[in-house]
């Protein structure tokens, strides 16, 4: 950090860049690969999260890919604090004035809250379809209007196509709304022309524990929502309490001697429905897999669940939080965290829906990984007699889980 006074001279430079240096995302396919994705304008920027936070890179990436049509239902927790603390928010708009719509609910009902947003959106779009069909059947609309309305109805679930058609429809109905009641109604509903991308964001405390019943209810609904679980393996915002995502051996509040039972496999549980897209990702370990999983989840016409590994200041990284991305890579390479995707659409093609993206771990590095984080290393200092047994159990659990995934793949 530098003193504010020393940086004031840069304000004019920043203003110049913000006002005159335009986005280059129209020059590339931002969804094609990792490099291209970073030409997209971030619609989540300058959050107040801890330095090196493992959560915010995922939120930023989603805003780059879908932010101009994104709706977010956010659980209470770290992600709600850095996303919506008065008087500022890191969510912003692009040059067209489009950006994410964000709202915050509680630990226990954030998924239901997001489902409600999706159901309301469905209802309003159904009303649009009804009005357009009435316009097509009426005599008050010109033939070219009817043609565009019919094209929208046939493509209303195609995000890019609805963007294209919205740019045609809005000026048409605005020009005719004083003469045509159908056009007036469509003009009033114009914000629903573009297919929205509904995201539900929460931490592991909300998703694995307090709000799990709601999460299960929402994915069981079959509705087209995307749930992002920012898995820090503790209740981060409330001070590092143990959750069902906390692995064996880790010290956390309410598990001061090291947790004694294994981590809940939320992702694998969700796959049992058979119609839920599920992915487990770690950006620092495999950026391409992260991008692919997020794109597949959003494109899947049903519920999706993405579980993202997020190093946290509560972990006590000995290398420092500036190395959080590298810590994710270490976690995957040693077998602590595993990368995989479950895509029900593949089963419809006669393929295995489960894809294990992690390579065979280097298990020799597992214990070293644990000792590189204070949440584990503290067990060795405070409970040396039990540390070896707990760390051995942690490694055995990780091997058991990886071997289970191998059998599915």
Per-region residue spans from a language model:
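Non-heme iron-sulfur electron-transfer modules
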Residues: 1-36, 98, 145
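Glycine-rich ThDP/TPP pyrophosphate-binding loop and its adjacent helix/strand module
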Residues: 180, 194-200, 209-226, 230-360
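Active-site diphosphate/adenylate-binding microenvironment
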Residues: 54, 58, 148-182
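A glycine-rich phosphate-binding loop feature that marks nucleotide/adenosyl-phosphate handling sites
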Residues: 2-4, 75-84, 285-287, 309-316
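Conserved thiamine diphosphate
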Residues: 36-41, 45-49, 104-119, 123-140, ...
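Flexible, low-complexity linker and terminal segments
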Residues: 1-5, 95-154, 310-409
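N-terminal amphipathic, basic-rich helices that act as targeting or association modules
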Residues: 36-39, 44-87
């Amino acid at each position: 950090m530098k003193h504010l006074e020393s940086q004031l001279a840069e304000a004019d430079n920043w203003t110049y860049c913000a006002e005159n240096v335009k986005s280059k995302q129209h020059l590339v396919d931002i969804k094609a690969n990792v490099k291209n994705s970073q030409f997209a304008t971030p619609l989540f920027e300058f959050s107040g999260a801890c330095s090196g936070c493992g959560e915010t890179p995922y939120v930023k990436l989603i805003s780059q890919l879908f932010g101009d049509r994104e709706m977010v239902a956010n659980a209470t927790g770290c992600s709600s604090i850095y996303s919506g603390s008065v008087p500022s928010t890191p969510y912003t708009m692009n040059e067209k004035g489009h950006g994410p719509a964000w709202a915050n609910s509680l630990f226990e009902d954030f998924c239901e809250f997001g489902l409600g947003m999706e159901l309301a959106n469905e209802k309003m779009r159904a009303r649009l379809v009804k009005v357009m069909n009435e316009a097509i059947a009426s005599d008050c609309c010109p033939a070219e209007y009817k043609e565009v309305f019919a094209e929208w109805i046939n493509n209303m679930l195609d995000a890019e196509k609805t963007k294209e058609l919205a740019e045609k429809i809005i000026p048409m109905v605005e020009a005719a709304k004083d003469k045509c009641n159908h056009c007036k109604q469509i003009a009033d509903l114009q914000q629903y022309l573009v297919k929205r991308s509904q995201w539900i964001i929460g931490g592991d405390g909300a998703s694995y524990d307090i709000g799990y019943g709601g999460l299960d209810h929402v994915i069981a609904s079959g509705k087209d929502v995307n749930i992002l679980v920012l898995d820090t393996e503790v209740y981060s915002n409330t001070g590092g309490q143990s959750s069902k995502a906390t692995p064996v051996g880790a010290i956390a509040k309410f598990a001061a001697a090291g947790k004694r039972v294994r981590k809940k496999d939320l992702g694998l549980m969700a796959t049992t429905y058979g119609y839920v897209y599920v992915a487990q990702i770690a950006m620092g370990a495999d950026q391409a897999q992260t991008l692919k999983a997020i794109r597949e989840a959003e494109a899947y016409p049903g519920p999706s669940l993405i579980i993202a590994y997020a190093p946290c200041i509560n972990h006590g990284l000995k290398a420092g939080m500036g190395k959080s991305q590298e810590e994710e890579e270490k976690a995957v390479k040693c077998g602590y965290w595993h990368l995989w995707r479950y895509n029900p659409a593949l089963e419809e093609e006669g393929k295995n829906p489960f894809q294990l993206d992690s390579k065979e771990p280097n298990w020799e590095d597992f214990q070293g990984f644990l000792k590189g984080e204070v949440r584990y290393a503290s067990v060795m200092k405070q409970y040396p007699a039990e540390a070896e047994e707990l760390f051995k159990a942690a490694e055995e659990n990780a091997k058991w889980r990886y071997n289970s995934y191998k059998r599915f793949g």
